[in-house]
Amino acid sequence: MRYTNVSILLGMLVIFVSPMVFADDLTPIPEGKPQVVQWFNTHVGPLAQRKGLDPALVAAEAAPRIINVNPKGGEFKTLTDAIKSVPAGNTKRVIIKMAHGEYREKVTIDRNKPFITLMGQPNAMPVITYDGTAAKYGTVDSASLIILSDYFMAVNIVVKNTAPAPDGKTKGAQALSMRISGNFAAFYNCKFYGFQDTICDDTGNHFFKDCYVEGTFDFIFGSGTSMYLGTQLHVVGDGIRVIAAHAGKSAEEKSGYSFVHCKVTGTGGGIYLGRAWMSHPKVVYAYTEMTSVVNPTGWQENKTPAHDKTVFYGEYKCSGPGSHKAKRVPFTQDIDDKEANCFLSLGYIQGSKWLLPPPAL
């Protein structure tokens, strides 16, 4: 009789207690694309199923505030005004729901306004657009969207810089789409358009999933520690074209860019996967489809020969005609399973502490 009661009690616990997800920083993203969804759902579950998140984040997510923005009229007509309504020192998640339309604004989210989410609809994505250039604002401040705060999230939005493409003659023609300088930022199904320096992936831990990034030269650059999962990297224009310019300056730095299950596309050919803007760049492409637009050498030759020994350019189980390694530069690392796992798990971006899925609204 005693054992029967215990069995009943255990059964009730199974029914009524929700499973808790301890996000695993060690389990790598699987090689098979069909398994990626299950991997994500297992390790990036919603707040109610999670343990180990930062306490400040848990408190912030307890009672989110929702703001509606619509250029045609609503609670706020501009994104800038909506952000101004968030108090300095904010401690609560603020979800800014953006109606479909064009938001011609130069938007900055200050460091003292964490926990902000910009959210659009997947079939009617709002567009943040501006035409700032380095000549007017300085390179990193030319971005249409600048995020300085922590715990930022963007879902289903488009960000553009509509300044003309640099012609190689005009000084200060760099024009950023976005600069992300805050820690713990996630981007889901977002699109970024620019030419040179499209995204300044500046500093902090960042996660991009199912995104699209378009540019010409160094169009993802900075010192961020970022994972790009299932993201299309589309190269346009002509002349020398480079995707990633990671700004690592020493062997001790932990930052770097990891591109996983991405796709490299573009016009023309001769595209470089990355270059040594600084002495110690760290860039890895894993399970990535590389079309014929990729230069057979893969990576741009280093202008400083000493950098041949300090760069970390890794390729792991990539596919497509652009992934052939016969003509790769000699300083490319063909990394093994153990090395690859460091760039394939959430631990690379400290994901178990902060990474949440998009809000279900």
Curated annotation (Swiss-Prot):
Family, similarity comment: Belongs to the pectinesterase family.
Q: Which organism is it from?
A: Arabidopsis thaliana
Q: Signal sequence span per UniProt?
A: 1-23
What is this protein's name? Probable pectinesterase 48
Q: Does the keyword Membrane apply?
A: no
Q: What class of enzyme is it?
A: hydrolase
Q: What is its EC number?
A: 3.1.1.11
State where substrate binds. Answer: 174, 275, 277
Localisation per UniProt entry: Secreted, Cell wall
Tissue expression from the record = Expressed in mature pollen grains in the anthers and on the stigma. Found in pollen tubes within the style.
Q: Which UniProt keywords apply?
A: Aspartyl esterase, Cell wall, Cell wall biogenesis/degradation, Hydrolase, Secreted, Signal
